[in-house]
């Protein structure tokens, strides 16, 4: 029996009445290399005095280098991109992206989704969303969600890098996402949010 995989997830979004989008990225690595990937993430953070590696705090050269190094690691990245995302609708968009993400990850052998922790009530919303999404899975499916602060789990940083690269691509900076092309599956979904 195969060991269920863990996906590490983070998000990025752009609110806009017409062109808004929500990116939910999940990074999945073979369990045997989790420690290796953690070390890579710590190395990418370098000597910067930050608690975690974060796409938006890197310059373009660092972003491209990070994407290149992440692409060299065995694993895959599932991304759901929801549109539209008008102002104050990002939580609804997140739920739509997360629902689809659960189904896709389960089909790839993932049984545990570890997401970056947010406020307690927002974490509860994620748990409720996953509980609802499980109805689309086989009755015997074992799929659970947990939350952790990114400062405690560098594997979440990999998902931040993927989400950032996809967001940047949508905003016209194509190189980082192109480097991840061979290990990334991106699915576009309608958030059902309509326009503001």
Predicted regions mapped to residue ranges:
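Phosphate-ester processing/binding pockets and catalytic centers
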Residues: 1-196
């Amino acid at each position: 029996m195969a060991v269920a995989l863990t996906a590490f997830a983070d998000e990025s979004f752009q609110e806009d009445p017409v062109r808004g989008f929500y990116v939910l990225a999940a990074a999945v690595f073979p369990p045997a290399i989790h420690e290796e990937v953690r070390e890579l993430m710590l190395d990418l953070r370098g000597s910067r005095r930050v608690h975690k590696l974060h796409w938006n705090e890197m310059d373009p050269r660092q972003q491209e280098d990070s994407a290149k190094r992440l692409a060299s690691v065995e694993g895959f990245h599932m991304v759901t991109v929801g549109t539209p995302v008008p102002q104050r609708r990002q939580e609804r968009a997140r739920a739509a992206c997360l629902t689809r993400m659960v189904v896709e990850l389960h089909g790839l052998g993932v049984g545990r989704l570890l997401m970056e922790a947010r406020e307690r009530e927002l974490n509860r919303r994620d748990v409720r969303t996953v509980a609802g999404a499980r109805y689309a899975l086989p009755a015997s499916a074992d799929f659970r969600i947990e939350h952790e602060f990114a400062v405690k789990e560098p594997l979440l940083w990999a998902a931040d890098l993927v989400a950032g690269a996809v967001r940047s691509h949508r905003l016209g900076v194509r190189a980082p996402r192109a480097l991840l092309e061979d290990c990334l599956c991106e699915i576009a979904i309608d958030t059902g949010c309509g326009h503001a």
